[in-house]
Each structure stands twice: as structure tokens, then as C-alpha cells.
Amino acid sequence: LLFRNNIMRVGELIAYELSKTLDYEERDVQTPLGTAKVNVPTDKVVLGTIFRAGLPFHQGFLNIFDHAGNAFVSAYREYEDDAHTKVGIHVEYLATPDLNNATLLIVDPMLATGGSMEMGYKAFLTKGTPKRVHVVCVIASPEGIEHVRRTFPEDTTIWCAAVDPGLNEHKYI
């Protein structure tokens, strides 16, 4: 429970910082004392998460972006050898709103090889082309960051709370 809550809390903190990069417009809002001018985001934000470990992180983002759409994909590793040194990725389930012109935040706590992130992103693309993509994680490896830089659009922003020195022989952080 403590781990899940802390992952959610990190999600809230990164979401707050990321919110500063969105586009806003000023709108009049009616309050009990009159009309106030407030800045509201104009981006159509969609939170994309790779199932299971990503759920508490997703919730942290949803606590900040409470009007965001929700997208989910199931992607997991398939080991191609007995030593678990060759890794493939399998994608099964996909549920997402239309992503055309959306600001897609792909939130997943760990970015190890980048393979699941890439396959999840490609699955999301079957539902539209986002205007902007942010890849967000709690911890990443240099290999995973480089993989995202090679396989995602050039203007993708990568957000991570920590960068690990590298992957072990089993491709784990």
C-alpha cells in the first residue's frame, strides 16, 4: 500500500510540473461572489497507461488531470531464451478514446528497455495521431531513454524522476 501511494504521489508531482507545458486560455467562471477570469487548459489530454504496474501512477496523473481521457494497453515481456537475456514484447488489450490532436501522456513507472513503451505507443496510434506525446516514468535506464528518442516523434518529451545507471543482464533496472 505504501509503495502504491508513493507511486501515485510521484505521479501527482510530475503531472503538476508537466501541466506547466500545456496550452491555456482565459475563461470567465461564475463564482458565488461574481465572475472570475481563470486560465484553463485547451489541450485534450489523454492519459495512456501500460497495464498493471502503471495503474497507481496513472491515478496520480488523474488526480491532477481530472478531465483527461483514459487509454489502456496490456503489454508484457516475452523471454526468447532460457537465460532471459533476449526479450520480446507482446501486446494484447487496448482501450482508448480517439487520440487525433490529443496531448498523449504515456505514464508507466519504469522505462527499462523501452520496448513495452514503444509497442504501447504503436498500439495507441491505431486510435489516432496525437498532437503531442509525453513519456513519463518514475525511473528510467539510459537504454530506455535512448530507445524512446529513436522510436518516438522528435518532439516527444521524456519526464522521469530518476535515471538508473543501466540494465542488468536480464534487462531489468
Task: Please name every model-derived segment.
Residues 1-173:
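PRPP-associated nucleotide enzymes
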